[in-house]
Amino acid sequence: MQIYKVGGAVRDRLLGRPVSDIDWLVVGASVEEMHAKGFRPVGADFPVFLHPKTGEEYALARTERKSGRGYGGFTFHASPEVTLEEDLIRRDLTINAMAEDDQGNVLDPFHGRADLEQRLLRHVSPAFAEDPLRVLRVARFAARYAPLGFRVADETLELMKQIAASGELQALTAERSWKEIERALMEDEPQVFINVLSDCAALKQLMPELEGDAAALAALTQAAEHHQPLHIRWACLLHNLKPASIKALNQRFKAPRECQELAMLVGECASNGHRALQLEPEDMLALLQKFDVYRRPQRFEDFISVCQMVARGSGQAYPQADYLRAAAAAARAVEAKPLVEAGLTGQALGEALRHQRLEALKAYKANAEN
């Protein structure tokens, strides 16, 4: 039995990046031997075990064969006879197909180290084209390592084009696709993810609504530079679309509720946000009510953040941000307690609250214009 570190842990150590998770590969062992040593099986599709002391995952070396469509269309074979090289050759990129033994020696049968030095994302073998999820994974790696100068190798981009043309991308589940999209959006240069998908003709199949949308990429770039959370980045990416298209993308990838809600609100309300300084008090009140700003003030603040990222993406300042925040504060300063104490309830209470909030917004607008 031989145990190796593999994949990202080896890659990131050689790049001088922090290593968070370690993938362990076991060569020359059977399932029975792993059980005998106290390892606990957890893999549903292929033999993966948890270390009895550390809880880390250890996978038996395996081969794979294409047996159906999509990410899950593979048959796996694990046995003590599977060699290290046979396991590594099934991996996606050469930089992910290196192993490290217990002496710290790097085993590199597919020249991943050279590709690290040349800053290339290159596929290991033609079998790369059998897994459509790899199109998204490579685009995500391109986004992650763009700050280090990495690019997708020309021949790998050609294979990605072949996958896109094959129709296999349609076999990807919403959950698997979103997992890659989510991780890519949280990289330092997420716009590279979209650009690579466009370069290999995958974007027009997965997210055709975004094809050629430079404003979306500019806003997303700003969101990343300002370290915004996922739901703000997603809303920035979709901000230039009509609500129907936003809804379609949300549903296509089953985006989390927070992402869906903010993206839809931006699509429906951004034009009023941009016109904030010209809005009549009645329209401002309607905008604040749309966001339920009295009970969910953070959602309105997130909306303002998206609008700011959009403006910065086009090289503009956004004085509307302070105006919107102050208007919200003026409306929220109106309290229901005095009205309740005066005996108002139900519809009468609601109408009185609305009237006082409207008066507060009128006073704020008049003061801001003087």
From Swiss-Prot:
Q: What cofactor requirement does the entry state? A: Mg(2+)
Name this polypeptide is given:
CCA-adding enzyme
Positions with a binding annotation for ATP: G8, R11, R91, R137, R140
**Gene Ontology terms describing biological process:** RNA repair; tRNA 3'-terminal CCA addition
Native source organism of the sequence: Pseudomonas putida (strain W619)
Indicate the family of this protein: Belongs to the tRNA nucleotidyltransferase/poly(A) polymerase family. Bacterial CCA-adding enzyme type 2 subfamily.
Q: What is its EC number?
A: 2.7.7.72
Function of the molecule: Catalyzes the addition and repair of the essential 3'-terminal CCA sequence in tRNAs without using a nucleic acid template. Adds these three nucleotides in the order of C, C, and A to the tRNA nucleotide-73, using CTP and ATP as substrates and producing inorganic pyrophosphate. tRNA 3'-terminal CCA addition is required both for tRNA processing and repair. Also involved in tRNA surveillance by mediating tandem CCA addition to generate a CCACCA at the 3' terminus of unstable tRNAs. While stable tRNAs receive only 3'-terminal CCA, unstable tRNAs are marked with CCACCA and rapidly degraded.
Q: By which gene is this protein encoded? A: cca
Q: Which reaction does it catalyse?
A: a tRNA precursor + 2 CTP + ATP = a tRNA with a 3' CCA end + 3 diphosphate; a tRNA with a 3' CCA end + 2 CTP + ATP = a tRNA with a 3' CCACCA end + 3 diphosphate
Identify the Pfam families for this entry: PolyA_pol, PolyA_pol_RNAbd
Please share what else the UniProt entry notes about this protein.
Answer: A single active site specifically recognizes both ATP and CTP and is responsible for their addition.
* Entry keyword set: ATP-binding, Magnesium, Metal-binding, Nucleotide-binding, Nucleotidyltransferase, RNA repair, RNA-binding, Transferase, tRNA processing
Q: Name one GO molecular function term.
A: ATP binding
Q: Which domain of life is it from?
A: Bacteria
What are the binding positions for CTP in this chain? Answer: G8, R11, R91, R137, R140
Q: Quick one: which residues bind Mg(2+)?
A: D21, D23
Q: Fetch the InterPro entries from UniProt.
A: CCA_bact, NT_sf, PolA_pol_head_dom, PolyA_RNA-bd, tRNA_CCA-adding_enzyme
